[in-house]
């Protein structure tokens, strides 16, 4: 029996919002999990990373909907020491907390009132979930008998039972929303709750009246912190600075999402003293090859497809105690990776080169490129003199070497040496190592089919750069139309994978338009920078091979440009790292790397190749220039690199 698209369906859900709040039995425990040390931590954590790296999924796993899931068997001994309360900072809602109707101080109190009601709702909801079945009420007695009379110190009309108080607070939130959205109307202003005193009193009731909750600590997880207005950040920062048991605040944010460390007092947040940063993106990338392979096998197994180690089917990915085995068992690691590579095979460099020689269109382009290079020096030679199936990789590098001024007779001599297994410059001067991949991308640049180097599980890892969502989308598109026969999924064709990589890349380029307040601008930054790198890849000499990152030279950026650069980092359009290979006497700054997921759309390398030195003035044009100025920037590089015509270049503002 054949089932089409069953395998692709396994990867259709690639956003936390699609998975819901209860992730018990579905969440693949990340390999870095033990680094969080949640049982010991009593200091706020800042979970940092780009969109798609798994922050939201992790926070939902740590929150009560999963911890106290009806699908989980709980006892007083297995009841989590920390009860997680999850809140998401909704941009549209938060921006209603401003305007001339109130002073900023009053808006801050209104915001804290709303935050208090939201946290109280989560806390009471956790108790309700813990008593949701007869068995649980027997295991955790007394929840329904809780007396919340102490809450009347803050709200005299509040009922005292759990179910009634939940309804009352829900009603209070609704009335608050009505007041918030009708500032010019007759809605009475509510009495604002004091955030920490009210919540501490509520927690006190729970801890005093329920023995099994006596030592429990409540973790408030605020997701998408970067959506807060600045005064709201100061309010949350204050809660971070003064967090202590039994109520500790944690936040998740994109890079550069914390625009201020100021609190409501003169104090500022200090790392180490007040919080610890958990760089989820960096931690995930360290073991991403194994984690991605595990996720790949797990998703397919849930669809009834036989793939990967038996340990995955037995639930090792769902267990906190299984992490050490996953990391240390080399046989398990090998079997998991091999399973993913079997379904998503890639080409070795040698196989990719042979693919070119066997393809009529690609081999024809190779001959044309060699012929063009020969005309620069000695047209008496023929392209076929340099094309040898036993030296396929080296043959692909010949056009670049000819355009660098190497003599045809010298290249032939070096090829002969290599064929005879003698010392040769293709090896000792790293000609093949330096120019093979760049030469492959150049051959494919003007063609409708994407480069085969984008295909394969290992290529998908590099394209994803630790981003789970990007990896899942690459798998989803690759497996569309793939048959499952007898419970086995077939290997995906190389060209199909490469096309899927380009389609996914186009999707994520387009998605930059929705990246916050500056989304449209970031979309144009991606298109402009992508075209500059594409032009660099189109240079016949490949003297600066595989350019995919830049450094800024010639001064500091103006504030507006610096802000946009920060947005590029926040939304993972660019990644930043300390600069390497600084030329001349210039001081070391930073390298800005193009997100590799954009590479297939522009036909460029996903590797960190050579660097482009961009003057600060050009970066300012890139970040804040008008459309015509950005076009002129691209054309200036086209002229400087002596590239005629733009027929096979993407339109600068093409819609991905």
PLM regions with names:
Residues 184-252, 264-265:
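Conserved Walker B catalytic segment
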């Amino acid at each position: 029996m054949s089932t089409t698209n069953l395998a692709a369906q396994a990867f259709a859900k690639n956003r936390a919002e699609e998975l819901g709040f209860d992730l018990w039995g579905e969440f693949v425990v990340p390999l870095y999990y033990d680094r969080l040390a949640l049982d010991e931590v009593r200091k706020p954590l800042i979970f940092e990373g780009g969109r798609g790296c798994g922050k939201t999924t992790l926070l939902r796993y740590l929150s009560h909907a999963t911890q106290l899931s009806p699908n989980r068997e709980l006892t007083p001994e297995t009841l989590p020491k920390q009860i997680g309360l999850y809140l998401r900072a909704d941009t549209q809602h938060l921006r209603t907390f401003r305007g001339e109707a109130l002073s900023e101080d009053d808006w801050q109190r209104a915001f804290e009132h709303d935050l208090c009601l939201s946290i109280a709702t989560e806390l009471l909801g956790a108790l309700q979930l813990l008593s949701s079945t007869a068995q649980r009420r027997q295991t955790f007695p007394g929840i329904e008998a809780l007396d919340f009379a102490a809450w009347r110190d803050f709200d005299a009309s509040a009922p005292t039972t759990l179910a009634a108080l939940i309804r009352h607070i829900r009603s209070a939130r609704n009335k608050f929303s009505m007041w918030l959205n009708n500032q010019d109307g007759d809605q009475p202003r509510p009495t604002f709750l004091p955030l920490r005193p009210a919540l501490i009193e509520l927690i006190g009731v729970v801890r005093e009246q329920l023995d099994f909750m006596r030592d429990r600590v409540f973790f408030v997880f605020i997701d998408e912190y970067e959506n807060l207005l600045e005064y709201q950040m100061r309010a949350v920062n204050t809660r971070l600075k003064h967090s202590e048991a039994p109520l500790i605040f944690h936040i998740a944010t994109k890079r550069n999402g914390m625009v201020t460390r100021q609190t409501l007092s003169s104090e500022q947040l200090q790392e180490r003293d007040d919080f610890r940063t958990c760089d989820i993106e960096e931690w995930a990338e360290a073991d991403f090859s194994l984690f991605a392979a595990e996720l790949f096998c797990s998703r397919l197994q849930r669809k009834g497809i036989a793939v990967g180690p038996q340990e995955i089917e037995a639930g090792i990915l769902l267990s906190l105690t299984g992490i050490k085995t996953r990391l240390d068992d080399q046989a398990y690691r090998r079997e998991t990776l091999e399973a993913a590579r079997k379904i998503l095979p890639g080409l070795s460099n040698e196989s990719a080169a042979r693919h070119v020689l066997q393809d009529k269109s690609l081999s024809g382009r190779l001959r044309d490129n060699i012929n063009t290079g020969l005309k620069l020096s000695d047209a008496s030679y023929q392209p076929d003199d340099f094309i040898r199936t036993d030296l396929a990789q080296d043959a692909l590098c010949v056009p670049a070497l000819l355009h660098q001024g190497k003599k045809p007779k010298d290249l032939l001599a070096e090829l002969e040496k290599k064929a005879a297994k003698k010392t040769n410059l293709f090896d000792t001067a790293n000609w093949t190592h330096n120019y093979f991949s760049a030469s492959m991308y150049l051959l494919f640049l003007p063609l409708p089919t994407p480069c085969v180097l984008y295909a394969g599980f290992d290529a998908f890892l590099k394209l994803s750069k630790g981003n789970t969502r990007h990896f899942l989308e690459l798998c989803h598109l690759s497996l569309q139309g793939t048959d499952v026969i007898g419970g086995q999924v077939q290997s995906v064709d190389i060209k199909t994978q490469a096309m899927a990589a380009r389609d996914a890349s186009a999707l994520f380029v387009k998605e930059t338009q929705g990246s916050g307040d500056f989304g449209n601008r970031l979309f144009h930054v991606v298109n402009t920078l992508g075209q500059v790198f594409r032009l660099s890849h189109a240079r016949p000499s490949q003297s600066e091979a595989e350019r995919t990152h830049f450094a800024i030279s010639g001064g500091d950026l103006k504030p507006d440009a610096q802000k946009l650069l920060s947005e590029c980092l926040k939304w993972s359009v660019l990644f930043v790292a300390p600069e390497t290979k600084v030329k001349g006497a210039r001081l070391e700054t930073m390298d800005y790397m193009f997100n590799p997921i954009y590479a297939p759309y522009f036909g460029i390398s996903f590797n960190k190749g050579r660097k482009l030195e961009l003057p600060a003035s050009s970066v300012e044009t890139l970040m804040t220039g008008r459309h015509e100025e950005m076009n002129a920037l691209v054309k200036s590089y086209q002229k400087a690199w002596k590239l005629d015509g733009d027929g096979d270049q993407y339109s600068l503002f093409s819609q991905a």
